[in-house]
Amino acid sequence: MISNAIARRYAKALVQLGAEEDAVDRFGAELGQFAALLEGNADIDSVLKSPAYRIEAKREILKDVLAKLSLSGTVSNFLQVLLDRGRISFLPQIAHSYAAFADELSGVIRPVLTSAFPLEDAQVESMKGALVKATGKKVQLSVQVEPSLIGGVITKIGDKVFDGSVRTQLNRIQDILQKG
């Protein structure tokens, strides 16, 4: 939990800098680019995160990587601060929190709609329209198919779940019948 609080604090600071520079999307892309590079290159990742290497060596490696990626000065400085403070290992969580703060700033929600069967485009658009109307925000809807639902849909927005599946309704009926 402490790591999430740390990640959120750093992410919020970078989003605020991005808002001041009108570069929230660009900073998010650059942060994601660097996080993907670390994820795809275990050698660089382990050197930057390992306490066995001197900070000067880590700074040189980071400097070389940043030069090749051509990241903005703000994001480069941000990554150097993370390295200097021993927080570079929090980068995946920071990138995730950054995306959430950026969405909040731009009024975007990313609900996940799960249905028992593939939905037609008109049905998806109808659900999207209902979510826009209910939340007053831009909606980036993700649709999944889960046959075990039997029927109906489950909509997840952040940490809220709206379960209208047949499976859940049958489970409720079963609970009522068992309790007598």
UniProtKB/Swiss-Prot annotation:
Cross-referenced SUPFAM superfamilies: N-terminal domain of the delta subunit of the F1F0-ATP synthase
Superkingdom assignment: Bacteria
UniProt key word Magnesium: no
Bridged cysteine pairs (disulfide): none
GO cellular component, one term: plasma membrane
Topology term for the membrane: Peripheral membrane protein
Entry keywords, A to Z: ATP synthesis, Cell inner membrane, Cell membrane, CF(1), Hydrogen ion transport, Ion transport, Membrane, Transport
Compartments, as annotated in UniProt: Cell inner membrane
Subunit structure: F-type ATPases have 2 components, F(1) - the catalytic core - and F(0) - the membrane proton channel. F(1) has five subunits: alpha(3), beta(3), gamma(1), delta(1), epsilon(1). F(0) has three main subunits: a(1), b(2) and c(10-14). The alpha and beta chains form an alternating ring which encloses part of the gamma chain. F(1) is attached to F(0) by a central stalk formed by the gamma and epsilon chains, while a peripheral stalk is formed by the delta and b chains.
NCBIfam families: ATP_synt_delta, PRK05758.2-2
Function: F(1)F(0) ATP synthase produces ATP from ADP in the presence of a proton or sodium gradient. F-type ATPases consist of two structural domains, F(1) containing the extramembraneous catalytic core and F(0) containing the membrane proton channel, linked together by a central stalk and a peripheral stalk. During catalysis, ATP synthesis in the catalytic domain of F(1) is coupled via a rotary mechanism of the central stalk subunits to proton translocation.
PANTHER family: ATP SYNTHASE DELTA CHAIN
Recorded family membership: Belongs to the ATPase delta chain family.
Protein name, per record: ATP synthase subunit delta
